[in-house]
Amino acid sequence: MNPKFKITLAAIAGATLGAAAVQGLHAQAKLRAYTVTEVEVLDPAALSVYTPLILAAIKGAGGRTFNTAGGRTIAFTGEAPKRVGIIEWDSLEQAQAFVNSAAFSNLAPQRDKAEKYIRQYAVEATSN
């Protein structure tokens, strides 16, 4: 085999493998995000109706919930919230899309009866 051909073939193979590696690293670079919602329960009966609806909507949108309902919270600085909900998302964009979705908006009447949002925000992890 011609040495120039071997070098050219090796360069093409190297470039292809390098491009594949860069693509793989880029795919892994997507950072997870978490929404944190501090709430005050207004009506426990309404909350028992709302909870399965919002959990189904979150799951349908690809979110993963942590069972923090009724768990203890302690404050290291400032006041501890009364109740906190935490949801894991594949990306900050996915979290934002859910909060802006019809599935979330359509539950507002039930949510407003069940609980009051004190604060809701999303945070992106810096590594997976």
What are these regions (language model features)?
Residues 112-128:
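C-terminal end-helix/capping segment
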Residues 14-100, 123-128:
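Short S/T/G/P-rich N-terminal loop/turn motif that feeds into the first structured element of a domain
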Residues 78, 108-109:
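A short, polar/proline- and glycine-enriched secondary-structure boundary/capping micro-motif
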Residues 96-99, 109-115:
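Short, exposed beta-strand-loop hairpins at the edges of beta-sheets
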Residues 1-11:
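Bacterial N-terminal signal peptides that target proteins for export
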Residues 4-6, 68, 83, 111, ...:
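Basic side chains
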